[in-house]
Amino acid sequence: MRFLLAFAFVLLSAGLASAADKENTLYIDLKDNCRVVIEMRPDLAPKHVAQIKKLAREGKYDGVVFHRVIDGFMAQTGDPDGTGMGGMGERLPSEFSKEPHGRGAVSMARTQDPNSARSQFFICFKDSNFLDGQYTVWGKVTSGMEHVDKIKKGEPPSNPDKMIKVQVAADAKD
């Protein structure tokens, strides 16, 4: 009997962990049915993750272009105007951590004011440790980095790639 109860507890716990993971997983769909999967890290940046989820759930990121893509550095998006000068949502206080800006790190863009992040974010193509402790890391690409590598380069790129659809995995229909 104890074995059955223990087994049931393990199964139930695994199901709860899976649901929690979906709540903290972001899907970014790009052209050609390519998907980028990001593990969001509310343990590092709870306010930033909450804002990203809110904007994704409101459809605010759908159709937004990658307006600044620097080869060997990063791909930046999240400005509804596509210029790099705009943003959505409230200004967020910095949530800097010791999390490194390695390949696939997802971090918030901001002005010179550390407390100015809103909706723009970038994905690192390679280690960018010079950003550590100065920008808020809120996630990491866990799948689809090969698609990020193919995003059109430029500042701004001509005919830029865009995020077709952005959704929290817990809300995804597919």
Please identify what each model-predicted range represents.
Residues 5-11, 15-174:
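Cyclophilin-like peptidyl-prolyl cis-trans isomerases
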